[in-house]
């Protein structure tokens, strides 16, 4: 799998290219111990360089990682974390929005409802998923599934990964803002545990619409913001070239968001980002979800709702 190295990873990319070149040379002939030793040394050097680079990433670099084309999406996490997933479609009012997926699944022995944004890999899939930007029918589908989960006393797990809610004319005509607002209101009062995780981009109201929970997590190299760095830069400085400055000023990275008390935990990613090893990223996320769900299941409905209310009301207070 091509890792699609980002600009700041160029030194790592150069080393990996050398490793691949030596590997191909050795593959075609007899086993050469000297080449194998050189490959081992280069791999160690690459790992050391990766640790150094990723130990000091800025908010803009994290933003690039959050959008990495090979980063695992909701449909990559579901089979790695859950079993017996049965997708449920449609909002029962207008259409089935492919930018939001959801359905019943098993988390080990626990039945749950899982809901998440879904982007696409290739052009055809990106168009089908509307680049991960849901329309009102997507959020109404999510709401239908969450209310179903409450009826059957199922915990709700959501995965957030969207640049934002779709801003098209049709979406606005069908009540985009109302759909988002209704989700916020209903999620705040659902009588079942809700665990939300930002796995990539957490873009504005489009993220919040499935992001009101008892526990909110972010993957190590995910972002959460009211607007994209490019959008902010275009408004403040009239140029998207100022996006790195905007990213730092907005504080979009997980560490900065946690300092503000807006999330509960940061889920560690493999060295280099979740796209380097989907299985390890999923295993880390599963462990966090299971631990948090065990804590929430020990609470009564009254305690659950009281804690959720206190969490939400604490935002914005010093």
UniProtKB/Swiss-Prot annotation:
The keyword Lipid metabolism appears for this protein: yes
Main location class: cytoplasm
BP-aspect Gene Ontology terms: fatty acid biosynthetic process; malonyl-CoA biosynthetic process
Keyword DNA-binding applies: no
One GO molecular-function entry: acetyl-CoA carboxylase activity
EC code: 2.1.3.15
Family matches, as Pfam families: ACCA
Family: Belongs to the AccA family.
Subunit composition and interactions: Acetyl-CoA carboxylase is a heterohexamer composed of biotin carboxyl carrier protein (AccB), biotin carboxylase (AccC) and two subunits each of ACCase subunit alpha (AccA) and ACCase subunit beta (AccD).
Name of the protein: Acetyl-coenzyme A carboxylase carboxyl transferase subunit alpha
